[in-house]
Amino acid sequence: MAKCFITGKKKSFGNSRSHAMNASRRTWKANLQKVRILVDGKPKRVWVSARALKSGKVKRV
């Protein structure tokens, strides 16, 4: 799984609980989008989290 270029977000781990409270491991995937942004003055296609895009931490090219 990819990682956010800006915030470093990646998938997180936890338990899925049944009605009987039995635990089985599961993952939550980060909402990552592949976008073109300027990196060192050049356009580059990277994975960026939706939160970073919405908050304006990056500017699309």
Curated annotation (Swiss-Prot):
One of its GO terms (molecular function) is structural constituent of ribosome. Pfam families: Ribosomal_L28. The keyword Ribosomal protein applies. InterPro entries: Bacterial_rp_bL28 (IPR050096), Ribosomal_bL28 (IPR026569), Ribosomal_bL28/bL31-like_sf (IPR034704), Ribosomal_bL28_bact-type (IPR001383), Ribosomal_bL28_sf (IPR037147). The keyword ATP-binding does not apply. One of its GO terms (biological process) is translation. GO terms for cellular component: ribonucleoprotein complex; ribosome. Disulfide bonds: none annotated. Keywords: Ribonucleoprotein, Ribosomal protein. Belongs to the bacterial ribosomal protein bL28 family. HAMAP family: Ribosomal_bL28. This is Large ribosomal subunit protein bL28. The lineage of its organism: Bacteria, Bacillati, Bacillota, Bacilli, Bacillales. The gene is rpmB.
